[in-house]
Amino acid sequence: MYDSSTGIIRNYINPLIGDLPMQSVTVKTVDIFIHDLHRTRSAAEKYHAVKQDYISDSQVEKVFKLARCAFNQAVRWNVIPQNPFNQANLCKAKCREREIWDAETIRKALDTCRDANLYVCMNLSFACSLRIGEILGLTWNNVHISEPEIKDDDAWLYIMQELARVKRSALAALNNKNIYHIFPAWTGKTTSTVLVLKKPKTDSSIRRVWIPKTVAYVLQELRKNQLHQIELAGCDYTDYNLVIAFPNGHPCEEKRINQAFTKLKAEAKLPDVVFHSLRHSSATYKLKLNHGDLKATQGDTGHAEIDMLTKVYAHILDSDRKITAQRFEEAFYQPQNSPEQKDNSPSSPDIAALITQIQQYPELGKILSDVLAKQASTDENTENGNGNLSDSE
């Protein structure tokens, strides 16, 4: 967060309005600033191959929000009387719908997966709606999967930290704020970045998530295998108490999971999605199961704002839309009393209702018995007549 914010200031805010006194910035100035941003080349092309030359609409929105935040602080400090960014016109960036897997595809992926760490990560992302950083930063002291808890459907995880790679300069600037643990550099070389366990970016991300029994048993098996590895490795194992770790106990970075995920997609010939889309699939699937209970789903995903679910995650799958069309047809266009729905075939008797009637009115049973006896006699005479006709021929 610190690195991205300073990058936005350095690449997009300072070059365009950095020299202006805050008191001189008006709503018109902000409108011109937004106009110029759309014609600013992306700073990413200096370091990476990018598909577009100019800054994207979503990036313009990020720049705008950061500048507005700075001017809000200036208002609080009485540097300026009001924030011109609050009255400026910014077109909302359109959220591109992310491709997701349906439940059948995820089941196929899990059945095909042979990588133990990836298998657990996929289960936690889909069943628990966790971000990859939250999964990789999960420690065993925050995993509650005892037999009584599983039996009572009360197995749960406590999400309070995430694994991330950050710049050392950012750590120094923030004085290690919200950092719980800094991992050493195992290569022995001094690097510009370092792996850390840190507080999630929002308070709502700190949460309790209940887990299905199957996932709890998967975690139990993982812990059993991990303890066996610790016993075999001895002093060669560095125990950081991480749920997802390498055989020597070192933390597993996101890029390792992404590499394994890419390999799995190729081997199983699965649709090309990013790992984070499993979290989107999770939210979508849960909204289907709980009939659109946004608050319950938000509790699992840890979103700060509920509209993130309605805007981004509430995918409507084609199969559901087809079912809706079928139900509409049945409910509106083909009511039960329509001519198209009439069935001219004899209706089968309701045996249960008939028995009840006979029990209530014994004389009805006698009448029915006489009718059946008469019908049987008629059928017998008919058969005899047909037999005589056949003999005469």
Give residue spans per PLM region.
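C-terminal catalytic core of tyrosine-transesterase DNA break-rejoin enzymes
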Residues: 58, 76, 123, 127, ...
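Short, polar N-cap/turn motifs at the start of nucleic acid-interacting alpha helices
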Residues: 142-151, 253, 272, 291-314
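Catalytic-site neighborhood detector that most strongly recognizes the C-terminal catalytic loop/helix
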Residues: 92, 96, 100, 151, ...
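C-terminal secondary-structure termini that scaffold catalytic or DNA-interacting sites
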Residues: 145-156, 161-206, 215, 247, ...
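Basic, Lys/Arg- and aromatic-enriched nucleic-acid-binding interface segment
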Residues: 43-46, 50-63, 76, 80-140, ...
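Active-site/catalytic core of tyrosine-dependent DNA strand-transfer enzymes
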Residues: 7, 182-196, 200-270
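N-terminal core-binding DNA-recognition domain of tyrosine site-specific recombinases/integrases
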Residues: 1-77, 95, 250-256, 271-277, ...
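N-terminal DNA-binding module of tyrosine recombinases/phage integrases
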Residues: 1-31, 222-238, 318, 330-349
